[in-house]
């Protein structure tokens, strides 16, 4: 086989592996459960924004990432509205992905979650935020 052909195959294979790793698992587990994503639309007080991000990055995210079934976690800051209205007063969206809702609930029941989530929640201007749970296909 020619060197150029080998390099093309190697690069294509590496790209496929990287894409799969970045996207995470989306197939149903052996028990038939699909991964889940939890979306929260949050109104974070601008004065407390730095504190919220510090707790999220230094405490909450590392603790969540060590849990069984953890897939991904993101804190998204709204930068612009392209079409349709944004949720009223919300400037952040929290997205958490787990292999199943059962595993997410086990994480919610841990002492570290019970200690760190209230720190994040205390930075909100309102305790009334949307909680949307999605199955991932």
How should each PLM-predicted stretch be described?
Residues 1-8, 14-31:
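N-terminal twin-arginine translocation
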Residues 15, 21, 54, 112-113:
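Residues in and immediately flanking transmembrane alpha helices
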Residues 35-43, 75-110:
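Short, well-ordered beta-strand segments in beta-rich or mixed alpha/beta enzyme
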Residues 44-49:
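Short, surface-exposed ligand-recognition loops at beta-strand->loop->(often short) alpha-helix junctions
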């Amino acid at each position: 086989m020619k060197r150029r052909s080998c390099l093309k195959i190697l690069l294509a294979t590496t790209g496929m592996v990287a894409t799969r790793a970045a996207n995470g698992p989306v197939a149903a587990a052996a028990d038939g459960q699909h991964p889940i994503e939890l979306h929260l639309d949050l109104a974070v007080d601008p004065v407390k924004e730095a504190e919220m991000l510090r707790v999220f990055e230094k405490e909450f995210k590392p603790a969540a990432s060590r849990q069984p079934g953890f897939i991904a976690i993101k804190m998204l800051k709204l930068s612009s509205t392209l079409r349709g209205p944004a949720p009223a007063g919300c400037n952040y969206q929290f997205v958490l992905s787990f292999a199943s809702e059962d595993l997410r609930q086990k994480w919610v029941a841990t002492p570290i979650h019970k200690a760190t989530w209230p720190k994040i929640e205390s930075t909100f201007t309102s305790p009334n935020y949307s909680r949307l749970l999605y199955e991932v296909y």
